[in-house]
Amino acid sequence: MNSSTDPTFSELNASFTNTPDTLFATSVSSDPSHGFGEEDYACGTFNCSPKEFVAFVLGPQTLPLYKAVLITIIFGGIFITGVVGNLLVCIVIIRHSAMHTATNYYLFSLAVSDLLYLLFGLPTEVFLYWHQYPDLFGMPFCKIRAFISEACTYVSVFTIVAFSMERFLAICHPLHLYAMVGFKRAIRIITALWIVSFISAIPFGLLSDIQYLNYPLDHSRIEESAFCSMSPKIVNEIPVFEVSFCIFFVIPMILIILLYGRMGAKIRSRTNQKLGVQQGTNNRETRNSQMRKKTVIRMLAAVVITFFVCWFPFHLQRLIFLYAKNMDNYLDINEALFSIAGFAYYVSCTVNPIVYSVMSRRYRVAFRELLCGKAVGAYYNSGFARDHSSFRESSAYDRVHSVHVRASQHPNKFETDSSSANRVLIKKTYSLPLPKNADSTVLSTTDIVIVLENSHTVCEEPKVENDIWIENEETCI
């Protein structure tokens, strides 16, 4: 969390002992017309020195050693796993040309945004537990960190939503997906969401600054109280937190639930249809189909749960800060939420590579090659079907044991670029094993049709031809 994305910094950090109410009282008391009374600071008859006053409002300059060490260890583990995981995703996508797909471009964008946020946000966050005030980095760093951290947060949310939309179209509306398929479209979308995210984060960068407490007796500024935050007055007057909550949590959460719920229902429906057709087959195929269905649905559920768990505490804390400062035990609740929200917020940067990448067999093989130095690169051009989604059920060779060949009468209908000229349309007519060196995109049909290709085009044109209905069951992005 940071000076702008986290409400705790707008209230001087939830770990500070008497943060929100006393801080706002301080801001008001800087006006000479506002009389200072015992109710404002509860500092007795106010015999406090400036140093004692700062300690009363902001809490201790350094948190207890056990807490600082524990948080450093936990956040250090999050930092290492998050940086390593996201770096591996980026390196794998860059190194292997077979990974240059629309889906992986979204994953690359997500990994970069998570990396930037971890690098700019987490070290400073840990430092605050050891030295809460005065701020040592200055106003430029305060603004830059607030701006970049907020922007990267928005990029992550937008990327997850865009990625979910791609999956939804591929699974539920494959005929519509073909009209939009292509790397350039994915790059344009990613570029647009980065631009929109950075524009949306500009107010947080502009409004964040070094804030100070004012000594109530003479209204002088206490230099030792410097901290990076948005002005409490601005937070109360401009609904930055409310807008952020609606646009970057409520709406994305609703979209993700609807999209993945629809995808889960579609996968379940198709699996049940297959089981009905396969009643005469052996029980092993039925069990395998059921296992694949459960695996995919669990992954879909994991996406929704992960998004909610990682982001809800963060936004809940903002809302409590804005609307529940007068509730009983507010400070205790806010301090607990600070720890929970901070942990969940940064854990999302670590979990994303797992949820969206590591669950894919292709990524697991690539990671083993990268970490262990094993020469398994041939996997990417071997007999496995393209595995561009973490929801991949199986390879083409595992699912289709024999297919039949015929020449396509209209090959040009399938061309999407000049590199796609060496494709063969295969239809069930004569028995022929699927070549193990085929790089294929699986298309579920009533009469099996598979397109073998040697290009980077990742989704073939859905087609209705005679008695053939080509329906894309899995993501072909």
Swiss-Prot record:
What biological-process GO terms show up in the record?
body fluid secretion; cellular response to desiccation; G protein-coupled receptor signaling pathway; neuropeptide signaling pathway; positive regulation of calcium ion transport
> Which ranges make up the Extracellular topological domains here?
1-72, 131-145, 211-237, 317-335
Q: Per the record, GO CC terms?
A: basolateral plasma membrane; membrane; plasma membrane
Q: Which GO terms describe its molecular function?
A: neuromedin U receptor activity; neuropeptide receptor activity
Tissue expression per record: In adults, expression in thorax and/or abdomen.
Q: Spell out the subcellular localization from the entry.
A: Cell membrane
List the disulfide bonds in this chain: 142-228
- What residues are glycosylation sites in this protein? 2, 13
Q: Record's Gene3D superfamilies?
A: Rhodopsin 7-helix transmembrane proteins
Taxonomically, the superkingdom here is Eukaryota
Q: Where do transmembrane segments lie in this chain?
A: 73-93, 110-130, 146-166, 190-210, 238-258, 296-316, 336-356
Keyword annotations of the record: Cell membrane, Disulfide bond, G-protein coupled receptor, Glycoprotein, Membrane, Receptor, Transducer, Transmembrane, Transmembrane helix
The family note in this entry says: Belongs to the G-protein coupled receptor 1 family.
* Function statement: Acts as a receptor for the neuropeptides CAP-1 and CAP-2, but not CAP-3. Probably a component of signal transduction pathway that leads to Malpighian tubule fluid secretion in response to these ligands.
Q: What is this protein called?
A: Neuropeptides capa receptor
Q: Please tell me the species this chain comes from.
A: Drosophila melanogaster (Fruit fly)
User: Which gene carries the instructions for this protein?
Assistant: CapaR
